[in-house]
UniProtKB/Swiss-Prot annotation:
Main function: Cell wall formation.
Keyword terms of this UniProt record: ATP-binding, Cell cycle, Cell division, Cell shape, Cell wall biogenesis/degradation, Cytoplasm, Ligase, Nucleotide-binding, Peptidoglycan synthesis
Keyword ATP-binding listed: yes
Lineage, uppermost ranks: Bacteria, Pseudomonadati, Pseudomonadota, Alphaproteobacteria, Hyphomicrobiales
UniProt-recorded name of the protein: UDP-N-acetylmuramate--L-alanine ligase
Principal subcellular localization: cytoplasm
Pathway assigned in UniProt: Cell wall biogenesis; peptidoglycan biosynthesis
UniProt family annotation: Belongs to the MurCDEF family.
Residues bound to ATP: G114, T115, H116, G117, K118, T119, T120
Matching SUPFAM superfamilies: MurCD N-terminal domain, MurD-like peptide ligases, catalytic domain, MurD-like peptide ligases, peptide-binding domain
A Gene Ontology term for the protein's cellular component: cytoplasm
Gene Ontology MF terms in the entry: ATP binding; UDP-N-acetylmuramate-L-alanine ligase activity
Length: 466
C-alpha cells in the first residue's frame, strides 16, 4: 500500500537538515501538505520556502498548527517542545528513514550505502540514469551541483537514495538495488561493535527482493569478506582488482579530469564488454571507484555505453566534495567534507594527482569522540599534503576530552615524520600563512564537516583583498 494523500499536514522538526529537506521537497512535489521548523535559517530552509513550503525558525509547540503527522530525525531530542506537543496530541511520530521508505514505495529504488562515498556515488547514479532517459527521482545527502538541491522529482520509475547507516535505520529502506562502497568502523557509539556494523550491511544487501541485487566494492577487504557471506541474493562486484565483475582499468589523469576504461564481465557466460575512453571531471582513484559503482548499476538497467560515457563526462559534482571555491595568483582553493582519516587520505591523494604544485591541507577535526577513537589514523592520513594546518576541534555539541586536542594531533603528526604540520587558533591566521607559503600551481584544500566550509569560501577573497 502506498501512503495516501489523506494523511493531512506533515510537519518536519529539523526541516533544514540535509536528509530531512530532500524528503520534505519530494513529499511536497508529490502533492502532500508539508511544513516544518529548524533551529536556524539556512540555504536549505530558504530553498524550501521558495517552493511554497512554510518553514518556522525556532522550535515552539505552536509551530505544529494543524499538523497530523510529525517527522523527526535522530538528532531531535525528546525534550524538543514540538515533539513533546505532538506526543501530547497523540500524533503519529515518523522517523526520517521511515518516511524515506514510504517515498521509496512509489518507485523501484537504488539505495547507496557505505561508510564513505555515498553522496558522490548517489549523485553519479542519478546522473547516469538521467543521461539514459530514465528520469529518476533523487534524494541525496548533499547538494548536487547540477540540480542546486539535494532532491529531484522525476517522472521515471526509478528512485535513487543515499542510505545513511549511522543509526541503523537504513535497514528500513525497501531497495531493489543495494550498493555498498566500503565498510569502516564508524558509528560505534550506536552499534556498539564493528561486528554489528558488518551485520547491518549484510542485512542491507540481503533485504533486496529476489529479483534485485547488491553492487559491492571488492577493492575494500571488509566488503569483499561480506560478499562471501551474502546468502540467496545476486551480487555484482566492482573495483580495480582483476576479479571484479565491473572493473576499471587504465586510470590516468588529464589535469583534474580522470580518464579510464571499464571492463564488464558476465559471470554466467564469461563474456566481456569494454567501455573505453570514459572521462570523469574529478580527480582521484576513489572517485573513479565510485563512478564504477554507478556504471555497474546503469549497465544492469540497460543503459548503453554511449549514454554512460555522455552522462559521466557531464557530471558536475556535489557541493563540499572537492569543490573549487576560488583562485589567487595561480593558487587554487578547494572545500571538502572529508572528516574521517580514510576520506582525508583519499582527498589529498586526489589533489596530489591533479597538480604538479604543492598540496596544503587545512583541517578542522570534527567531534572530540571521533578524534579520540581514531587518533592514530588521523596522525597518519596527511602524508600527501606538503603542509598540514590544523584548526581547533569543531565540537558539534560535545564536551572536550582530556588529552584530545588539535594541538596534540599536530604533535602526533610531527612525531610520525611529517615535515610541516602547524596548529592555528582560528581562521584569521590562514590568509597570512597562505600568502607567505603558496606559489602558482599549489592547491589549498580545506577539510572538515564543521564551519570550515565558510573559511574555504572566504580565503580567496581575503587573499585578493590584501
Amino acid at each position: 500500500m502506498k501512503m495516501p494523500q489523506t494523511i493531512g499536514l506533515v510537519h518536519f522538526i529539523g526541516i533544514g537538515g540535509i536528509g530531512m529537506s530532500g524528503i520534505a521537497e519530494v513529499l511536497h512535489n508529490l502533492g502532500y501538505k508539508v511544513q516544518g521548523s529548524d533551529q536556524a535559517d539556512s540555504a536549505n530552509v530558504q530553498r524550501l520556502r521558495d517552493k511554497g513550503i512554510e518553514c518556522f525558525v525556532g522550535h515552539k509547540a505552536e509551530n505544529l498548527g494543524d499538523a497530523e503527522v510529525v517527522v523527526v530525525s535522530t538528532a531531535i531530542k525528546k525534550t524538543n517542545p514540538e515533539l513533546k506537543a505532538a506526543r501530547e496530541k497523540l500524533l503519529p511520530i515518523v522517523r526520517r528513514a521511515e518516511m524515506l521508505a514510504e517515498l521509496m514505495r512509489f518507485r523501484q529504488a537504488v539505495a547507496i550505502g557505505g561508510t564513505h562515498g555515498k553522496t558522490t556515488t548517489t549523485s553519479m547514479v542519478a546522473t547516469l540514469l538521467e543521461a539514459g532517459g530514465l528520469d529518476p527521482t533523487v534524494i541525496n545527502g548533499g547538494i548536487i551541483n547540477a540540480y542546486g538541491t539535494n532532491a529531484r522529482m522525476g517522472d521515471g520509475e526509478w528512485m535513487v537514495v543515499e542510505a545513511d547507516e549511522s543509526d541503523g535505520t537504513f535497514l528500513k529502506l525497501p531497495a531493489d538495488i543495494a550498493v555498498v562502497t566500503n565498510i569502516d568502523p564508524e558509528h560505534l557509539d550506536h552499534y556498539g561493535s564493528f561486528d554489528k556494523v558488518r551485520e547491518a550491511f549484510r542485512q542491507f544487501v540481503e533485504n533486496v527482493p529476489f529479483y534485485g541485487f547488491g553492487v559491492m566494492c571488492t577493492d575494500h577487504p571488509e566488503v569483499q569478506a561480506l560478499v562471501g557471506r551474502i546468502e540467496d541474493r545476486r551480487v555484482i562486484t566492482y573495483g580495480e582488482n582483476a576479479q571484479a565483475d565491473v572493473r576499471f582499468t587504465n586510470h590516468r589523469m588529464a589535469g583534474a579530469t580522470s580518464e579510464f576504461d571499464v571492463v564488464i564481465r558476465d559471470r554466467k557466460t564469461g563474456s566481456q564488454s569494454t567501455i573505453s575512453g570514459l572521462r570523469l571531471p574529478m580527480p582521484g582513484r576513489h572517485n573513479v571507484s565510485n563512478a564504477t559503482a554507478a556504471i555497474a548499476v546503469a549497465h544492469e538497467l540497460g543503459l548503453s555505453g554511449e549514454a554512460i560515457k555522455k552522462g559521466l563526462s557531464s557530471f558536475a559534482g556535489v557541493k563540499r566534495r572537492f569543490t573549487h571555491t576560488g583562485s589567487w595568483n595561480g593558487v587554487d582553493v578547494f572545500d571538502d567534507y572529508g572528516h574521517h582519516p580514510v576520506e582525508i587520505s583519499a582527498v589529498l591523494k586526489a589533489a596530489r594527482s591533479a597538480t604538479k604544485g604543492r598540496v596544503i591541507a587545512i583541517a578542522q577535526p570534527h567531534r572530540f569522540t571521533r578524534l579520540h577513537d581514531l587518533f592514530n589514523e588521523f596522525s597518519a592520513c596527511f602524508n600527501d599534503a606538503d603542509t598540514v594546518i590544523v584548526a581547533p576541534v569543531y565540537a558539534a555539541g560535545e564536551d572536550p576530552i582530556d588529552g584530545v586536542s588539535s594541538d596534540e594531533l599536530v604533535s602526533r603528526i610531527r612525531a610520525g615524520g611529517h615535515r610541516d604540520a602547524r596548529y592555528i587558533e582560528g581562521p584569521t591566521a590562514i590568509a597570512p600563512i597562505i600568502r607567505g607559503l603558496a606559489k602558482p600551481g599549489d592547491f589549498v584544500v580545506f577539510l572538515g564537516a564543521g564551519n570550515i566550509t565558510q573559511w574555504a569560501y572566504a580565503l580567496p577573497k581575503e587573499l585578493a583583498a590584501s
